[in-house]
């Protein structure tokens, strides 16, 4: 006896998130941009690797620019986000370009905050970071 087929499940209604935060983690090897809502739940993310770059090209400012634009585009299309606070961590070469790309993508930037972790004289750095 044939089993009755189930119909398609109804699609969930799109959550509309107007404001959120954009975290830019800029290391020397890569730049990762994560867009969250105000509670900290991840909405969209992108990086130099997800754009299609491999190896040392992931750490370039251009890859950071494309990653930031891609993450903002995902957040705008799926959740209708239009206001963000930008929080930057790290000192990689892509941090400035990522901020510029977020501003240029048509989303309103309310504030920019540098939250780079700085040790209070913790572990001894490697030779290249000790000057």
Curated annotation (Swiss-Prot):
Family per record: Belongs to the universal ribosomal protein uS11 family.
Name of the featured protein: Small ribosomal subunit protein uS11
Summary of the function given for this chain in its UniProt record: Located on the platform of the 30S subunit, it bridges several disparate RNA helices of the 16S rRNA. Forms part of the Shine-Dalgarno cleft in the 70S ribosome.
Keywords: Ribonucleoprotein, Ribosomal protein, RNA-binding, rRNA-binding
Gene: rpsK
GO molecular function terms noted in the UniProt entry: rRNA binding; structural constituent of ribosome
Gene Ontology annotations for the cellular component aspect, listed alphabetically: ribonucleoprotein complex; ribosome
Keyword NAD: no
PROSITE patterns on file: RIBOSOMAL_S11
InterPro entries: Ribosomal_uS11, Ribosomal_uS11_bac-type, Ribosomal_uS11_CS, Ribosomal_uS11_sf
Cytoplasm recorded as keyword: no
GO BP terms: translation
Subunit structure: Part of the 30S ribosomal subunit. Interacts with proteins S7 and S18. Binds to IF-3.
Record HAMAP family: Ribosomal_uS11
Highest rank taxon of the organism: Bacteria
Annotated Gene3D superfamilies: Ribosomal protein S11
């Amino acid at each position: 006896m044939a089993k009755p087929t189930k119909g398609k499940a109804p699609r969930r209604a799109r959550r509309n998130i107007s404001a959120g935060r954009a975290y830019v983690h800029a290391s020397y090897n890569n730049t990762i941009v994560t867009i969250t809502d105000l509670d900290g739940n991840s909405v969209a993310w992108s990086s130099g690797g997800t754009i299609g770059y491999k190896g040392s090209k992931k750490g370039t400012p251009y890859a950071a620019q494309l990653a930031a634009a891609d993450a903002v585009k995902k957040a705008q299309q799926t959740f209708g986000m239009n206001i963000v606070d930008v929080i930057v961590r790290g000192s990689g070469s892509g941090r400035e370009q990522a901020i510029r790309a977020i501003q240029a993508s048509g989303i309103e930037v309310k504030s920019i905050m540098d939250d780079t972790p700085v040790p209070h004289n913790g572990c001894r750095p490697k030779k290249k970071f000790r000057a």
